Amino acid sequence: MIEGVMKEGFITTSYDSVVNWAKTGSLWPMTFGLACCAVEMMHAAAARYDIGRFGAEVFRASPRQSDLMIVAGTLCNKMAPALRKVYDQMSEPRWVISMGSCANGGGYYHYSYSVVRGCDRIVPVDVYVPGCPPTAEALIYGIIQLQQKIRRTHTIARV
């Protein structure tokens, strides 16, 4: 592809490829840190790992400014409506990463009366990051997997 650009001065591609490339390079995450996994999420954003290299530069505090929610930690029954409300306020297209055993399926507190057994019962999840707590490398790998999923989606519906 590079040789074609150097010789001809242009490349040909599809609209889907360009839009999906732009989406993968500008993920704006919103924190939904609920427990100890949030510490690893902050660790991934710090200087050593710097998820800004992967397009997730700044964690947003407002759901209207973000398109990626990282649910990190134990989701209790009282917090579940707030999670859904914040998810509904996010702009389209929106994605969710479930980070840690507790967010994935209840984890250590799976049999507790007050714990939701997986945030996928409340919001649709795109990528699951396992671990208790998962490392910063695992979260970065999850972001890379989400970027690959975004690249495979179709923006324009073919009729």
From Swiss-Prot:
GO CC terms of this entry: plasma membrane; respiratory chain complex I
UniProt GO BP: aerobic respiration; electron transport coupled proton transport
Top class in the EC scheme: translocase
Annotated cofactor note: Binds 1 [4Fe-4S] cluster.
Keywords assigned by UniProt, alphabetized: 4Fe-4S, Cell inner membrane, Cell membrane, Iron, Iron-sulfur, Membrane, Metal-binding, NAD, Quinone, Translocase, Transport, Ubiquinone
Recorded superkingdom: Bacteria
Cellular location(s): Cell inner membrane
The enzyme's E.C. designation: 7.1.1.-
Pfam families: Oxidored_q6
Binding site for [4Fe-4S] cluster: C36, C37, C102, C132
Chief localisation class: membrane
Cofactor: [4Fe-4S] cluster
GO terms for MF: 4 iron, 4 sulfur cluster binding; iron ion binding; NADH dehydrogenase (ubiquinone) activity; NADH:ubiquinone reductase (non-electrogenic) activity; quinone binding
Binding partners and assembly: NDH-1 is composed of 14 different subunits. Subunits NuoB, C, D, E, F, and G constitute the peripheral sector of the complex.
Protein family per UniProt: Belongs to the complex I 20 kDa subunit family.
The protein's name: NADH-quinone oxidoreductase subunit B
Organism per entry: Paracidovorax citrulli (strain AAC00-1) (Acidovorax citrulli)
